[in-house]
């Protein structure tokens, strides 16, 4: 301890110092505590919710094809100091100072994005600032279309995505269909494969300026070459949305859209296993040569970059871009390629296991990471089966199948293999998952016979109440949790 004489000497000297020099800390201890303590100390309520979600993920079988478990290294960047900086603009062209390091991170992310997909930087560029997939598609459309121009994309009930311009007979569901004229193409309902012949006939009449090749619930490889040939005949752009399959494309375990596309968009958190973000890849160089020999260049880089910022977004999320750079580096590792190979092989095995249980699959199988189960032959729907699965800690999602008329009770169940392959599942594990799904379907059929109500919403509410109280559902839940909790999640080992 300081002697009283020394303490008096220190106080006397401090009186001669300016106010800022007499303070021990730049902020008070209480203010310092507010910004330095853990979430457990600052907000126990939110910390408890976080722990609940961690436990749910650990104790659940995650089959939703658009979900995955990202790596600890990616998570480290998502919660890092990179999120503190504001950086409107692009590397070397920011509207704020102090972005020298941020520029390095974004430039590295762009470089790795091209490397991850084997792209020549003289022929392709990439914007890594879009916040998610649907906005990325809007930015890309806006760069090459005027309001009222025409788009063709896969119909949502046939496996497409909302952001491809979905509308019904009475309602423009996606605002894309308000900004632009949209016309869907569909599957052949007998085969479950895209009906390319009808697509070509309709496109010749509709004359779209953009054809979208991509899906959210289509399990087969898309014929990009044929769609490219069609787009050339129409003078249209081919925009490929590979959000679901980008991880597979990076690992070269499925066909790549890049050789045939003008623009490629993707999310970054699905099979790619990165943070929640998006990218827009765009062609450079010469787009076409006229009959008189005049070269017409692509102008996509300038237009797309402008439509991202300042056209639609302000400051980018630097923590996400930095985390994405890490994920893209991981894409080039041999273990990542092996993982994607297992995602596809597991999906094929899972599909076979479901067929062996008597399930009908749309297109009779899969080439990718996802499977679409048609439940009509079991006289049950995806909504009720999803409800039983959810209460048994199995996450899957109801989905429309070709021919569906009810949005509340679609006939399909969409499942996939990326997340559980990350946790170490192989063929034997997916055999067991198929057994769990079969049990859940049988339970759903029994509960449906007991439900009460006059209108669809009442019937579904009654069904869910029965599922909450069902001893069979509780027993299935117990089996699932006991089994799946033994498999680690990233960062646990």
From Swiss-Prot:
Annotated signal peptide? none
Q: Which GO terms describe its biological process?
A: glycine biosynthetic process from serine; tetrahydrofolate interconversion
Q: Which cofactor does it need?
A: pyridoxal 5'-phosphate
- EC top class, in one word? transferase
What SUPFAM superfamilies does the record tag this protein with?
Answer: PLP-dependent transferases (SSF53383)
One CC-aspect GO term: mitochondrion
In which pathway does this enzyme or protein participate? Answer: One-carbon metabolism; tetrahydrofolate interconversion
| One annotated GO molecular function | pyridoxal phosphate binding
Keywords (alphabetical) are: Mitochondrion, One-carbon metabolism, Pyridoxal phosphate, Transferase, Transit peptide
Positions modified as N6-(pyridoxal phosphate)lysine? 270
| Compartments where found | Mitochondrion
Documented EC number(s): 2.1.2.1
Q: Kindly state which reaction or reactions the protein catalyses.
A: (6R)-5,10-methylene-5,6,7,8-tetrahydrofolate + glycine + H2O = (6S)-5,6,7,8-tetrahydrofolate + L-serine
Q: Which domain of life is it from?
A: Eukaryota
**Into which family does the record put it?**
Belongs to the SHMT family.
Assembly description: Homotetramer.
Instruction: Please share what else the UniProt entry notes about this protein.
Output: In eukaryotes there are two forms of the enzymes: a cytosolic one and a mitochondrial one.
Instruction: Report the protein's function.
Output: Interconversion of serine and glycine.
The entry's protein name is: Serine hydroxymethyltransferase, mitochondrial
Source organism of the structure: Candida albicans (Yeast)
